[in-house]
UniProtKB/Swiss-Prot annotation:
GO cellular component: cytoplasm; small ribosomal subunit
Keyword rRNA-binding carried by entry: yes
SUPFAM superfamilies referenced in this protein's UniProt entry, alphabetically: Ribosomal protein S19 (SSF54570)
Classification of source organism: Bacteria, Pseudomonadati, Pseudomonadota, Alphaproteobacteria, Hyphomicrobiales
GO BP: ribosomal small subunit assembly; translation
Name of the protein described by the UniProt record: Small ribosomal subunit protein uS19
Alphabetically ordered keywords of this record: Ribonucleoprotein, Ribosomal protein, RNA-binding, rRNA-binding
Pfam families with a match to the protein in the record: Ribosomal_S19
Recorded name of the encoding gene: rpsS
Organism this protein belongs to: Bradyrhizobium diazoefficiens (strain JCM 10833 / BCRC 13528 / IAM 13628 / NBRC 14792 / USDA 110)
Amino acid sequence: MVRSVWKGPFVEGSLLKKADAARASGRHDVIKIWSRRSTILPQFVGLTFGVYNGQKHVPVAVNEEMVGHKFGEFSPTRTFHGHSGDKKAKKA
């Protein structure tokens, strides 16, 4: 279900503080975050966030198309190794 409009987008408070500090300093360091559930806001465009996927921080460079999505969508938590091939086809 979609979040109701009157509530507004959810963003972790500490994330807003980190983003504002990064904008004020003018530095383009990776901002480490653990809040995968936070919504990407327009003020985050141009910043790079390190989104934690359970093992490491995956760098996510925010652009305009990402606004409105969640940070967790851009940091996969599971590794797909592929399906095994058909062994009978290799012998033929």
